[in-house]
Amino acid sequence: MIDILICIGAVTLGLALILAIAFKIVRRGALTFEIDGFYTHVMDGDPGPIIRDVQRDATAVLECKLDDPMSCSIKEAVECHVEAEAPECNVLLLSGGGQWGAFGAGLFKRLSEQSGAKELGLEGIGVITGISTGSLQALMMMVALDPKQTPVMRRHAIDRLVWGYSPEKESEVVRHTGLALVPFFGSAAGTAPLRKRIIEALCPDGDCRLVEAIGNSSIAGYAGFVEADDGSFRYADLRELVNKAPSLEKAAEALAAATMASSAMPVFHQQLRVAGSDGKAVSLYDGGVRRSVFFDRTMAIVDRQVRKEMASHGVTKASTTSQENFAEEYRKTAPKVYVVRNGPTVRKPAPELNRKSGPLKNGQRGYDLLVNESEIGAIAALRLGNPYGEILLTTADMYDTFPSTVGENFKDDEMFKPAFMARLRDLGRFKADRKDGPWWALSTL
Protein backbone atom coordinates (compact mmCIF):
# COMPACT_ATOMS: atom_id res chain seq x y z
CA MET A 1 0.00 0.00 0.00
CA ILE A 2 2.82 2.38 0.90
CA ASP A 3 4.58 1.51 -2.34
CA ILE A 4 1.43 2.33 -4.31
CA LEU A 5 1.09 5.69 -2.57
CA ILE A 6 4.73 6.45 -3.25
CA CYS A 7 4.24 5.59 -6.93
CA ILE A 8 1.14 7.77 -7.15
CA GLY A 9 2.98 10.61 -5.46
CA ALA A 10 5.96 10.24 -7.79
CA VAL A 11 3.74 10.21 -10.88
CA THR A 12 1.80 13.24 -9.62
CA LEU A 13 5.02 15.10 -8.90
CA GLY A 14 6.39 14.18 -12.31
CA LEU A 15 3.26 15.40 -14.08
CA ALA A 16 3.32 18.62 -12.08
CA LEU A 17 6.96 19.14 -13.05
CA ILE A 18 6.23 18.49 -16.72
CA LEU A 19 3.28 20.90 -16.63
CA ALA A 20 5.39 23.55 -14.90
CA ILE A 21 8.11 23.23 -17.53
CA ALA A 22 5.56 23.31 -20.36
CA PHE A 23 3.90 26.34 -18.78
CA LYS A 24 7.26 28.09 -18.59
CA ILE A 25 8.02 27.30 -22.21
CA VAL A 26 4.72 28.28 -23.84
CA ARG A 27 3.79 31.27 -21.66
CA ARG A 28 4.45 34.33 -23.74
CA GLY A 29 5.55 36.85 -21.17
CA ALA A 30 6.05 40.43 -22.27
CA LEU A 31 7.11 41.67 -25.70
CA THR A 32 9.80 44.26 -24.96
CA PHE A 33 11.25 47.06 -27.08
CA GLU A 34 14.54 48.70 -26.14
CA ILE A 35 14.45 52.23 -27.58
CA ASP A 36 17.16 54.63 -26.45
CA GLY A 37 15.67 58.04 -25.67
CA PHE A 38 12.07 56.86 -26.16
CA TYR A 39 10.59 58.62 -23.13
CA THR A 40 12.29 61.90 -24.05
CA HIS A 41 9.57 62.22 -26.69
CA VAL A 42 6.68 61.04 -24.51
CA MET A 43 4.49 63.58 -22.69
CA ASP A 44 1.90 63.38 -19.92
CA GLY A 45 -1.66 63.68 -21.14
CA ASP A 46 -3.71 66.18 -19.16
CA PRO A 47 -7.32 64.93 -19.03
CA GLY A 48 -8.66 68.46 -19.45
CA PRO A 49 -10.40 70.85 -17.07
CA ILE A 50 -13.71 69.02 -16.68
CA ILE A 51 -12.19 65.66 -15.73
CA ARG A 52 -9.76 67.47 -13.45
CA ASP A 53 -12.77 68.96 -11.69
CA VAL A 54 -14.24 65.48 -11.24
CA GLN A 55 -10.91 64.26 -9.83
CA ARG A 56 -10.37 67.29 -7.60
CA ASP A 57 -9.91 65.32 -4.39
CA ALA A 58 -7.62 62.72 -5.95
CA THR A 59 -4.15 62.62 -4.48
CA ALA A 60 -2.36 63.13 -7.79
CA VAL A 61 -4.08 64.69 -10.79
CA LEU A 62 -1.78 65.38 -13.70
CA GLU A 63 -1.94 68.73 -15.43
CA CYS A 64 0.05 69.25 -18.57
CA LYS A 65 2.34 72.14 -19.28
CA LEU A 66 0.85 74.56 -21.75
CA ASP A 67 4.01 74.45 -23.86
CA ASP A 68 3.99 70.72 -24.56
CA PRO A 69 4.25 69.73 -28.26
CA MET A 70 0.56 68.99 -28.80
CA SER A 71 -0.48 72.30 -27.22
CA CYS A 72 1.95 74.11 -29.48
CA SER A 73 0.71 72.21 -32.55
CA ILE A 74 -2.94 73.06 -31.87
CA LYS A 75 -2.06 76.68 -31.04
CA GLU A 76 -0.34 76.93 -34.42
CA ALA A 77 -3.33 75.27 -36.09
CA VAL A 78 -5.73 77.85 -34.62
CA GLU A 79 -3.47 80.76 -35.60
CA CYS A 80 -3.05 79.32 -39.10
CA HIS A 81 -6.79 78.70 -39.43
CA VAL A 82 -7.69 82.37 -38.92
CA GLU A 83 -5.05 83.82 -41.25
CA ALA A 84 -6.75 85.39 -44.22
CA GLU A 85 -4.88 83.64 -47.04
CA ALA A 86 -3.41 80.66 -45.18
CA PRO A 87 -4.59 77.09 -45.84
CA GLU A 88 -6.85 75.48 -43.26
CA CYS A 89 -5.16 73.70 -40.35
CA ASN A 90 -7.66 71.17 -39.08
CA VAL A 91 -7.49 68.26 -36.61
CA LEU A 92 -7.99 64.55 -37.36
CA LEU A 93 -8.82 62.15 -34.51
CA LEU A 94 -8.45 58.42 -35.25
CA SER A 95 -10.08 55.98 -32.84
CA GLY A 96 -9.18 52.44 -31.88
CA GLY A 97 -10.83 49.27 -33.15
CA GLY A 98 -8.28 46.60 -34.10
CA GLN A 99 -9.29 44.96 -37.37
CA TRP A 100 -12.03 47.57 -37.75
CA GLY A 101 -9.24 49.92 -38.80
CA ALA A 102 -9.68 48.37 -42.25
CA PHE A 103 -12.68 50.71 -42.57
CA GLY A 104 -10.46 53.76 -42.20
CA ALA A 105 -7.95 52.30 -44.64
CA GLY A 106 -10.64 51.81 -47.28
CA LEU A 107 -12.08 55.26 -46.60
CA PHE A 108 -8.83 57.16 -47.03
CA LYS A 109 -7.84 55.11 -50.07
CA ARG A 110 -11.06 56.07 -51.81
CA LEU A 111 -10.82 59.73 -50.76
CA SER A 112 -7.30 59.78 -52.16
CA GLU A 113 -8.51 58.30 -55.45
CA GLN A 114 -11.30 60.88 -55.66
CA SER A 115 -8.77 63.72 -55.42
CA GLY A 116 -7.24 62.76 -58.76
CA ALA A 117 -3.61 63.48 -59.54
CA LYS A 118 -3.08 65.27 -56.22
CA GLU A 119 -3.55 62.03 -54.25
CA LEU A 120 -4.67 64.17 -51.29
CA GLY A 121 -7.78 62.69 -49.74
CA LEU A 122 -8.41 65.28 -47.01
CA GLU A 123 -6.94 68.75 -47.30
CA GLY A 124 -6.02 71.17 -44.55
CA ILE A 125 -5.00 68.76 -41.77
CA GLY A 126 -2.44 70.13 -39.30
CA VAL A 127 -2.68 67.73 -36.33
CA ILE A 128 -3.44 63.99 -36.14
CA THR A 129 -3.96 62.00 -32.95
CA GLY A 130 -4.39 58.24 -32.84
CA ILE A 131 -5.24 55.60 -30.26
CA SER A 132 -4.81 51.85 -30.77
CA THR A 133 -5.43 51.01 -34.44
CA GLY A 134 -5.81 54.75 -34.98
CA SER A 135 -2.17 55.26 -34.02
CA LEU A 136 -1.12 52.86 -36.78
CA GLN A 137 -3.24 54.84 -39.23
CA ALA A 138 -1.77 58.11 -37.96
CA LEU A 139 1.71 57.08 -39.13
CA MET A 140 0.57 56.69 -42.72
CA MET A 141 -1.83 59.63 -42.73
CA MET A 142 0.92 62.02 -41.60
CA VAL A 143 2.37 61.42 -45.07
CA ALA A 144 -0.76 60.64 -47.10
CA LEU A 145 -2.39 63.96 -46.06
CA ASP A 146 0.78 66.09 -46.14
CA PRO A 147 0.59 68.65 -48.98
CA LYS A 148 4.38 69.07 -48.88
CA GLN A 149 4.94 65.48 -49.96
CA THR A 150 4.86 64.45 -53.61
CA PRO A 151 1.75 62.70 -54.97
CA VAL A 152 3.91 59.60 -55.45
CA MET A 153 4.88 59.56 -51.78
CA ARG A 154 1.29 60.20 -50.67
CA ARG A 155 0.14 57.27 -52.79
CA HIS A 156 2.92 55.12 -51.31
CA ALA A 157 1.67 55.93 -47.80
CA ILE A 158 -1.92 55.00 -48.73
CA ASP A 159 -0.74 51.77 -50.34
CA ARG A 160 1.15 50.79 -47.19
CA LEU A 161 -1.88 51.68 -45.07
CA VAL A 162 -4.12 49.41 -47.14
CA TRP A 163 -1.49 46.65 -47.16
CA GLY A 164 -1.35 46.77 -43.37
CA TYR A 165 -5.09 46.09 -43.16
CA SER A 166 -5.11 43.39 -45.86
CA PRO A 167 -3.62 40.26 -44.28
CA GLU A 168 -4.12 36.96 -46.09
CA LYS A 169 -4.46 35.12 -42.79
CA GLU A 170 -4.81 36.09 -39.14
CA SER A 171 -1.44 34.60 -38.19
CA GLU A 172 0.26 37.35 -40.21
CA VAL A 173 -0.91 39.80 -37.54
CA VAL A 174 -1.19 37.86 -34.24
CA ARG A 175 -0.79 34.36 -32.82
CA HIS A 176 -4.38 33.98 -31.67
CA THR A 177 -4.90 31.20 -29.13
CA GLY A 178 -8.19 32.47 -27.68
CA LEU A 179 -9.50 33.61 -24.32
CA ALA A 180 -9.99 30.09 -22.99
CA LEU A 181 -6.22 29.52 -22.97
CA VAL A 182 -5.29 32.87 -21.40
CA PRO A 183 -4.29 31.20 -18.07
CA PHE A 184 -1.87 29.01 -20.01
CA PHE A 185 -0.42 31.48 -22.55
CA GLY A 186 -0.85 34.69 -20.54
CA SER A 187 -2.89 36.44 -23.24
CA ALA A 188 -5.38 35.67 -25.98
CA ALA A 189 -2.84 36.56 -28.66
CA GLY A 190 0.89 36.91 -29.12
CA THR A 191 1.89 40.08 -30.94
CA ALA A 192 5.36 39.30 -32.32
CA PRO A 193 3.86 39.01 -35.84
CA LEU A 194 2.28 42.46 -35.43
CA ARG A 195 5.68 43.94 -34.63
CA LYS A 196 7.08 42.43 -37.81
CA ARG A 197 4.09 43.60 -39.86
CA ILE A 198 4.33 47.22 -38.68
CA ILE A 199 8.03 47.33 -39.56
CA GLU A 200 7.26 45.84 -42.98
CA ALA A 201 4.49 48.39 -43.54
CA LEU A 202 6.91 51.22 -42.76
CA CYS A 203 9.97 49.75 -44.52
CA PRO A 204 8.86 47.33 -47.27
CA ASP A 205 11.88 45.27 -48.37
CA GLY A 206 14.09 47.57 -46.29
CA ASP A 207 12.93 50.76 -48.07
CA CYS A 208 12.37 53.24 -45.20
CA ARG A 209 11.56 56.38 -47.21
CA LEU A 210 8.11 56.42 -45.61
CA VAL A 211 9.73 56.68 -42.17
CA GLU A 212 11.83 59.60 -43.40
CA ALA A 213 8.68 61.28 -44.73
CA ILE A 214 6.99 60.90 -41.32
CA GLY A 215 9.90 62.73 -39.71
CA ASN A 216 9.68 65.51 -42.31
CA SER A 217 5.88 65.79 -42.26
CA SER A 218 4.26 69.21 -41.93
CA ILE A 219 1.51 67.45 -39.93
CA ALA A 220 2.05 66.88 -36.21
CA GLY A 221 1.19 63.32 -35.16
CA TYR A 222 0.71 61.79 -31.71
CA ALA A 223 0.01 58.26 -30.42
CA GLY A 224 -1.61 57.80 -27.01
CA PHE A 225 -1.12 55.00 -24.48
CA VAL A 226 -1.47 54.32 -20.75
CA GLU A 227 1.22 53.39 -18.22
CA ALA A 228 0.13 50.21 -16.44
CA ASP A 229 1.61 50.97 -13.02
CA ASP A 230 -0.14 54.26 -12.26
CA GLY A 231 -2.77 54.48 -15.01
CA SER A 232 -1.43 57.79 -16.34
CA PHE A 233 -2.19 58.66 -19.94
CA ARG A 234 0.80 59.62 -22.08
CA TYR A 235 1.41 60.33 -25.73
CA ALA A 236 4.41 60.10 -28.06
CA ASP A 237 5.49 62.74 -30.57
CA LEU A 238 5.83 60.62 -33.71
CA ARG A 239 7.95 63.09 -35.68
CA GLU A 240 10.45 63.41 -32.86
CA LEU A 241 10.75 59.64 -32.51
CA VAL A 242 11.95 59.63 -36.12
CA ASN A 243 14.08 62.75 -36.09
CA LYS A 244 16.05 61.87 -32.97
CA ALA A 245 16.67 58.23 -33.91
CA PRO A 246 20.21 57.27 -35.02
CA SER A 247 18.94 55.63 -38.23
CA LEU A 248 15.74 55.13 -40.19
CA GLU A 249 15.70 51.48 -39.13
CA LYS A 250 15.89 52.48 -35.46
CA ALA A 251 13.21 55.09 -36.11
CA ALA A 252 10.91 52.40 -37.52
CA GLU A 253 11.44 50.38 -34.32
CA ALA A 254 10.56 53.43 -32.22
CA LEU A 255 7.37 54.05 -34.22
CA ALA A 256 6.43 50.39 -33.89
CA ALA A 257 6.99 50.59 -30.13
CA ALA A 258 4.73 53.65 -29.77
CA THR A 259 1.91 52.29 -31.90
CA MET A 260 2.05 48.80 -30.40
CA ALA A 261 1.96 50.35 -26.93
CA SER A 262 -1.13 52.25 -28.02
CA SER A 263 -2.69 48.96 -29.18
CA ALA A 264 -1.72 46.64 -26.30
CA MET A 265 -5.11 45.78 -24.79
CA PRO A 266 -4.54 43.86 -21.52
CA VAL A 267 -5.40 40.13 -21.53
CA PHE A 268 -6.30 40.19 -25.23
CA HIS A 269 -2.80 41.14 -26.38
CA GLN A 270 0.59 40.07 -25.10
CA GLN A 271 1.90 42.56 -22.56
CA LEU A 272 3.99 45.30 -24.18
CA ARG A 273 6.95 46.96 -22.49
CA VAL A 274 9.25 49.70 -23.68
CA ALA A 275 12.64 50.33 -22.09
CA GLY A 276 14.14 53.77 -22.59
CA SER A 277 17.64 55.12 -22.03
CA ASP A 278 17.72 54.03 -18.38
CA GLY A 279 17.03 50.43 -19.35
CA LYS A 280 13.90 50.23 -17.18
CA ALA A 281 11.13 48.44 -19.05
CA VAL A 282 7.72 50.07 -18.49
CA SER A 283 4.47 48.17 -19.19
CA LEU A 284 2.13 50.12 -21.45
CA TYR A 285 -1.54 49.59 -22.26
CA ASP A 286 -3.82 50.41 -25.17
CA GLY A 287 -4.72 54.11 -25.05
CA GLY A 288 -8.36 53.08 -25.29
CA VAL A 289 -8.44 51.91 -21.66
CA ARG A 290 -8.65 55.63 -20.86
CA ARG A 291 -10.36 56.59 -24.09
CA SER A 292 -11.63 60.02 -23.20
CA VAL A 293 -8.31 61.49 -22.19
CA PHE A 294 -6.83 62.08 -25.63
CA PHE A 295 -10.08 63.47 -27.03
CA ASP A 296 -10.66 65.59 -23.94
CA ARG A 297 -7.08 66.80 -23.95
CA THR A 298 -7.22 67.79 -27.61
CA MET A 299 -10.55 69.56 -27.34
CA ALA A 300 -9.56 71.40 -24.16
CA ILE A 301 -6.54 72.85 -25.96
CA VAL A 302 -8.60 73.76 -29.03
CA ASP A 303 -11.17 75.54 -26.88
CA ARG A 304 -8.55 77.45 -24.90
CA GLN A 305 -6.67 78.58 -28.00
CA VAL A 306 -9.86 79.55 -29.87
CA ARG A 307 -11.11 81.71 -27.00
CA LYS A 308 -7.67 83.29 -26.66
CA GLU A 309 -7.58 84.08 -30.38
CA MET A 310 -11.09 85.53 -30.28
CA ALA A 311 -10.24 87.66 -27.23
CA SER A 312 -7.20 89.07 -29.06
CA HIS A 313 -9.67 90.50 -31.57
CA GLY A 314 -12.00 91.81 -28.88
CA VAL A 315 -14.56 89.01 -29.17
CA THR A 316 -15.73 87.62 -25.84
CA LYS A 317 -19.10 86.54 -24.48
CA ALA A 318 -19.41 89.91 -22.76
CA SER A 319 -18.59 91.87 -25.91
CA THR A 320 -20.99 90.17 -28.33
CA THR A 321 -24.62 91.13 -28.73
CA SER A 322 -25.98 87.59 -28.66
CA GLN A 323 -25.11 83.98 -27.98
CA GLU A 324 -25.63 83.28 -31.69
CA ASN A 325 -23.01 85.84 -32.71
CA PHE A 326 -20.49 84.45 -30.23
CA ALA A 327 -21.14 80.90 -31.45
CA GLU A 328 -20.64 81.96 -35.07
CA GLU A 329 -17.35 83.72 -34.29
CA TYR A 330 -16.23 80.62 -32.41
CA ARG A 331 -17.12 78.40 -35.37
CA LYS A 332 -15.15 80.60 -37.78
CA THR A 333 -12.12 80.67 -35.47
CA ALA A 334 -11.96 76.99 -34.53
CA PRO A 335 -10.29 74.42 -36.78
CA LYS A 336 -12.55 71.69 -38.10
CA VAL A 337 -12.24 68.43 -36.19
CA TYR A 338 -12.60 65.21 -38.18
CA VAL A 339 -13.28 62.02 -36.22
CA VAL A 340 -12.97 58.50 -37.62
CA ARG A 341 -14.65 55.89 -35.44
CA ASN A 342 -12.94 52.69 -36.58
CA GLY A 343 -15.83 50.52 -35.48
CA PRO A 344 -19.60 50.43 -34.99
CA THR A 345 -21.55 52.47 -32.46
CA VAL A 346 -24.07 49.75 -31.53
CA ARG A 347 -23.74 46.04 -30.82
CA LYS A 348 -25.81 43.32 -32.43
CA PRO A 349 -28.40 41.57 -30.25
CA ALA A 350 -27.16 38.35 -28.61
CA PRO A 351 -30.32 36.49 -27.45
CA GLU A 352 -28.32 33.30 -26.82
CA LEU A 353 -26.96 34.94 -23.67
CA ASN A 354 -30.44 34.54 -22.16
CA ARG A 355 -29.79 30.79 -22.24
CA LYS A 356 -26.04 30.59 -21.57
CA SER A 357 -24.23 31.55 -18.39
CA GLY A 358 -20.63 30.70 -19.35
CA PRO A 359 -18.03 33.22 -18.14
CA LEU A 360 -16.19 33.65 -21.46
CA LYS A 361 -19.18 34.59 -23.63
CA ASN A 362 -20.73 36.78 -20.96
CA GLY A 363 -17.41 38.38 -20.10
CA GLN A 364 -16.71 39.10 -23.76
CA ARG A 365 -20.18 40.60 -24.18
CA GLY A 366 -19.73 42.85 -21.17
CA TYR A 367 -16.34 43.98 -22.46
CA ASP A 368 -17.79 44.74 -25.91
CA LEU A 369 -20.61 46.82 -24.42
CA LEU A 370 -18.20 48.74 -22.18
CA VAL A 371 -15.88 49.50 -25.09
CA ASN A 372 -18.75 50.59 -27.30
CA GLU A 373 -20.16 52.94 -24.68
CA SER A 374 -16.68 54.26 -23.96
CA GLU A 375 -16.04 55.07 -27.62
CA ILE A 376 -19.34 56.76 -28.41
CA GLY A 377 -19.28 58.60 -25.07
CA ALA A 378 -15.83 59.96 -25.89
CA ILE A 379 -17.01 61.24 -29.26
CA ALA A 380 -20.18 62.79 -27.84
CA ALA A 381 -18.13 64.43 -25.08
CA LEU A 382 -16.08 66.31 -27.66
CA ARG A 383 -18.85 68.88 -27.60
CA LEU A 384 -18.14 69.71 -23.95
CA GLY A 385 -14.70 70.94 -24.90
CA ASN A 386 -15.61 72.40 -28.27
CA PRO A 387 -19.17 73.72 -27.98
CA TYR A 388 -19.55 75.54 -31.32
CA GLY A 389 -16.81 74.42 -33.71
CA GLU A 390 -17.36 72.05 -36.61
CA ILE A 391 -16.95 68.40 -35.58
CA LEU A 392 -17.35 65.99 -38.49
CA LEU A 393 -17.74 62.26 -37.86
CA THR A 394 -17.73 58.99 -39.75
CA THR A 395 -18.17 55.46 -38.36
CA ALA A 396 -18.11 51.83 -39.48
CA ASP A 397 -21.84 51.41 -38.90
CA MET A 398 -23.69 49.79 -41.87
CA TYR A 399 -20.93 47.18 -42.23
CA ASP A 400 -23.57 44.43 -42.30
CA THR A 401 -26.27 46.24 -44.31
CA PHE A 402 -24.62 48.22 -47.12
CA PRO A 403 -24.69 46.67 -50.62
CA SER A 404 -21.50 44.69 -51.16
CA THR A 405 -20.34 41.28 -52.35
CA VAL A 406 -16.77 41.79 -51.15
CA GLY A 407 -15.57 39.46 -48.39
CA GLU A 408 -17.93 38.65 -45.50
CA ASN A 409 -20.02 40.91 -43.26
CA PHE A 410 -19.59 38.89 -40.08
CA LYS A 411 -16.90 37.61 -37.76
CA ASP A 412 -16.84 35.18 -34.88
CA ASP A 413 -13.96 35.16 -32.41
CA GLU A 414 -11.30 36.18 -34.92
CA MET A 415 -9.16 39.17 -34.02
CA PHE A 416 -8.15 39.76 -37.64
CA LYS A 417 -10.41 38.03 -40.14
CA PRO A 418 -9.23 38.75 -43.72
CA ALA A 419 -12.67 38.37 -45.34
CA PHE A 420 -14.29 40.67 -42.78
CA MET A 421 -11.52 43.24 -43.16
CA ALA A 422 -12.08 43.17 -46.93
CA ARG A 423 -15.75 44.01 -46.33
CA LEU A 424 -14.73 46.87 -44.01
CA ARG A 425 -12.37 48.32 -46.63
CA ASP A 426 -15.25 48.20 -49.09
CA LEU A 427 -17.46 49.99 -46.54
CA GLY A 428 -14.91 52.81 -46.45
CA ARG A 429 -15.12 53.04 -50.24
CA PHE A 430 -18.92 53.01 -50.13
CA LYS A 431 -19.15 55.84 -47.60
CA ALA A 432 -16.63 57.97 -49.50
CA ASP A 433 -18.74 57.49 -52.65
CA ARG A 434 -22.03 58.51 -51.05
CA LYS A 435 -23.67 61.60 -52.51
CA ASP A 436 -23.27 63.52 -49.24
CA GLY A 437 -19.83 62.03 -48.56
CA PRO A 438 -18.62 60.08 -45.51
CA TRP A 439 -18.81 62.90 -42.93
CA TRP A 440 -21.69 64.31 -40.92
CA ALA A 441 -21.69 67.07 -38.31
CA LEU A 442 -22.28 66.69 -34.58
CA SER A 443 -24.96 69.01 -33.23
CA THR A 444 -23.74 72.08 -31.36
CA LEU A 445 -24.72 72.79 -27.77
Task: For each feature predicted by the language model, list its residue ranges.
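N-terminal type II signal-anchor transmembrane helix
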Residues: D3-G29
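C-terminal helical/tail subdomains of lipid-metabolizing enzymes
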Residues: D3-I4, R341-P344, L360-L445
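Active-site catalytic motif of lipid deacylating hydrolases and related acyltransferases
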Residues: L19-G106, P183-F185
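Patatin-like phospholipase
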Residues: V91-L93, W100-A192, K196-I198, L238-L248, ...
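Extracytoplasmic/secreted cell-surface and envelope-processing proteins
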Residues: W100-F103, A138-L139, D207, S232, ...
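Sec/Tat-exported extracytoplasmic proteins
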Residues: L111-S115, S132, M140-L145, V162-V173, ...
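Active-site gating loop/helix substructures
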Residues: G215-R307
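Internal helical hairpin/lid segments
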Residues: V293-F294, M299-A300, K308-V315, E329-I379
